[in-house]
From Swiss-Prot:
The keyword Cytoplasm does not apply. Transmembrane segments: none annotated. This is Probable nicotinate-nucleotide adenylyltransferase. Belongs to the NadD family. Pathway: Cofactor biosynthesis; NAD(+) biosynthesis; deamido-NAD(+) from nicotinate D-ribonucleotide: step 1/1. It is an enzyme of class 2 (transferase). Keywords: ATP-binding, NAD, Nucleotide-binding, Nucleotidyltransferase, Pyridine nucleotide biosynthesis, Transferase. Catalyzes the reversible adenylation of nicotinate mononucleotide (NaMN) to nicotinic acid adenine dinucleotide (NaAD). Its EC number is 2.7.7.18. The lineage of its organism: Bacteria, Pseudomonadati, Pseudomonadota, Gammaproteobacteria, Legionellales. It catalyses: nicotinate beta-D-ribonucleotide + ATP + H(+) = deamido-NAD(+) + diphosphate. GO terms for molecular function: ATP binding; nicotinate-nucleotide adenylyltransferase activity.
Amino acid sequence: MHSIAIFGGTFDPVHNGHIKTSLAIQANFGFDSYYFLPCKSPAIKPPSFASSEQRVEMLKLALKPYPDFKIDTRELDRDTPSYMVYTLQSFRQEYTDSSLTLIIGYDGLLNLPQWYQWEKIISLANLLVINREEFFQQPVPKSVQTLLNQYRNDDKNILLNHHAGSICLYNAGHYDISSTKIREQLKQHKDVKSNLPDLVYDYIKKQELYQ
């Protein structure tokens, strides 16, 4: 069975934490296809600071050394907000016989009940939840705990060989980097070069983004 991983985010900007997390995931799971999915107008996050075109360009630059990583722009090409359920339905129509796995952060798992038609997500894809220790102390919503009790399975072969319906928690390493922090530091003219791929850093400086 062809296995597909979908890593969604605003990537505003894409940073080394995104890359290192993805490399760790691929080293452990080895998905046949791995897509970075830039979001358009996230329904439960503030609007992005860079344009869609700029965010895609930064992704292209960041992923140049990693030809196995692809970019999927279907959310940007849509005229509606970024509802993941629509995106997964689109993937499922295109890849009817494949295993689909949506990669989300632990904070995304806690916020899952806020997602549009969130109950349908698990029927369309597996969930690979990236553990982040700072969220472990937060209470898990009852609806999410019920979901975990029913669908959690940390056997990686389940994700690779089942169309949908499993949740796996995985520690991909801890990287103290966030797009929000990078934007704030750039605005304060602080050095962020070590947190960004070199080509992305050069692009941000050239475009004078996040100033």
